[in-house]
Amino acid sequence: MGKLDKEFYENKKYHFRYYRKSLNHPFLVAVVIESENDDGKVVLSGFNMTRSIEMVLKNPDKFIRINNPNPEDDAPSFVCVDPIKNKPLKLFTRPIRDWELSLEDEIVIDSLLKERL
């Protein structure tokens, strides 16, 4: 864990949002880490799948799951907060049936998220 990461986890209020791959395969797809800044606004603070998965497993009571806001769409949504407008920002969706992921896919997901930010 780098110095900035260490300071973030020690000094900021934070919570986590996560998605699971599917009902049949409960492994995590991705975790978006958010924190409150000095004004109390929630901002996207970082994304690291491997470390985040470890934190989910160690602290399951601190996590909440966000459901897709569109009930007619069967795709999970990766959502974070736009740090400028402080509004939810929908990054991308993909049908659950297409999620066939392994740990090797985390780099691809990470890249997709960064491209959308």
Model-derived features: where do they sit?
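A residue-level signal for beta-strand positions that form part of recognition/binding surfaces
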Residues: 13, 40-43, 78
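Basic, Lys/Arg-enriched alpha-helical interface segments
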Residues: 1-3
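C-terminal terminal-subdomain/extension
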Residues: 67-117
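Short coil-to-beta-strand transition motifs
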Residues: 19-28, 74-76
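Compact nucleic-acid interaction/catalytic patches
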Residues: 23-68
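Short coil-to-beta transition motif at edge beta-strands of beta-rich domains
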Residues: 5-24
